[in-house]
Amino acid sequence: MKPTDFAKKLTDFLSKYLPCERGLSTNTIESYKTTFILFITFMEEKKNIAVNKLAIKNITKENIIAFLEWLQSERHCSTATRNVRLAALHSFFRYLQYEMPENLNEWQQILSIKAKKNIKKNVNYLTVDGIQLLLQQPDQSTKKGRRDLVMLSLMYDCAARVQEIIDLTPAMIRLTKPYTIKIIGKGNKPRIVPLMEKQVIHLKRYLVENKLLESHANFSPLFSNSRNEKFTRQGIANILQTYANAARVKDSTLIPKLSPHSLKHSKAMHLLQAGVNLVYIRDILGHESVLTTEIYARADSKQKREAIENAYVDVINKESPIWVGNDNLLDWLKNFK
């Protein structure tokens, strides 16, 4: 069966343009791929257009808007996720502006779709007591418990995203003074984060126990699951939830609803509360702009009150390619790496 124009362009976009011309990371391409799996599913279920019939002419501004609404109304995606999907679609249609300029008017109409305003939620973070309680839960008499303690404490100490922890290798750690760790962030951007000596002591023991100081292990995953494979994001999230549930039994007031990103938020808040400059916090977190980091300053109501009280002046008196055929497009997308 002859492939449709949509299938050809999508294949080239994902397998050639994004990795080769744009140089995007594997994780970003994976997110784009998921967007198109969802879009194809929507077109099949809601527009009755089978994947082997889906053509460029079927992709209109109206259908894109309907897809975005479907994500929220039927798949219960957040506004942030909706906007991520729209960004992926926008990237594809910017690509098509040059590949298929004869449809430029349609592409520009799609590109005119605005991101939906997202109401910012309060930052969810643990207090210092909460972090201490959480990190008391791994059983250090077991190899798994020791691994989990090092992994979660490193995620907190380095304010690392879960994918950044997954991508760590022993070669990224400097075990001589000054102790540092190299973290590869979004867009493959590296940053160097200082390590504290107490953290390094635990880390060295872990590396020795798991034979990760040997030269052949330099580029092996720093943390592996029970099958000796690289962790998934969900795998680490499950580990965190196990210990969070155990900690809640001891003191539920200290352990709010958590995700791996909560550890990053917690470290940022603790640095802010300790008086660390936002510019330094920005660099540790790997934010491009200090404006992104300011969310933590806005979130700390206790610090806001203290600042207001300290500045108070008493003015009132005292009293007061890879793809071949349309039928396999969904399979190709799901298996594309």
Where are these regions (language model features)?
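Conserved catalytic core of the tyrosine transesterase superfamily
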Residues: 1-337
